[in-house]
Amino acid sequence: MRERVIGSWDELQSAVFDNAWDETILRYRNNRVFRGVSDNRWGLVPSLNRCCPQNPALERHILRNFRKYGYADLTDCHSFWQLVAMGQQFGLPTRLLDWTYSPLVAAHFATEDINSYHIDGAIICCDMEKVNYCLPDALQEILRKESCNVFSMDMLDSVAADFSALQRLSPDPFAFFFEPSSTVNRIANQYALFSLSSDRDVLIDTLPCAEDAFLRLVIPAHLKLEIRDKLDYINISERMIYPGLDGICRWIARRYAPLGPMFHHPKGKDR
């Protein structure tokens, strides 16, 4: 994966909005999505692979138990894809990865953990169009028909009922992005979407045809506090990311933590 170290708040803005102009429609649009991580060393490894590294086949048992024990709160989940997306939003180990269309929401996730302010963070940028080069013909045709780069749940339902059906579409692994239904406010507020690999053992950034699709923007530890405070000024905070009392309490706890004395690095001083 290509890598670029960010030197300032202004450079971060320049990097995430680079090449956003689309001459064909005379608007600022691009095909990139973003993922913020508090530790730059982290790869694009789904929670399922982290939770069950020795036996990812436990995936079906995880989903079965989620449906069984969460039944009362899942009555509106009529689609397999909606079920998996809901589980991902609430911390269930899945093969999905969280992304956002908003680079500033990604910057929030890269800087929200105050226990990681001594570690470089990162925003990973992905060109969805390049990832879609790996798709089997049936899926590419759906995207062409809809003139888009991202699947909706209805589009997925029309071609594959679950992970097994998805894998049968091609002997070669592939990955794609899909938008969940906004059944909970945090999905809409985070401008969220997910990536998904047809083979749970294959990471999205290891696909041969997508190797040039990713860029890692490294946020040095000494920049985290400045970026964090400036995000608060433009209302990118836990109050918006996690609607409700949970987000308010997270925001208050961080806002009143003694981060300045702990992590402020005057310019020109040794960091």
Residue ranges and their predicted role:
Residues M1-R271:
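Catalytic-core elements of nucleic-acid end-processing and repair enzymes
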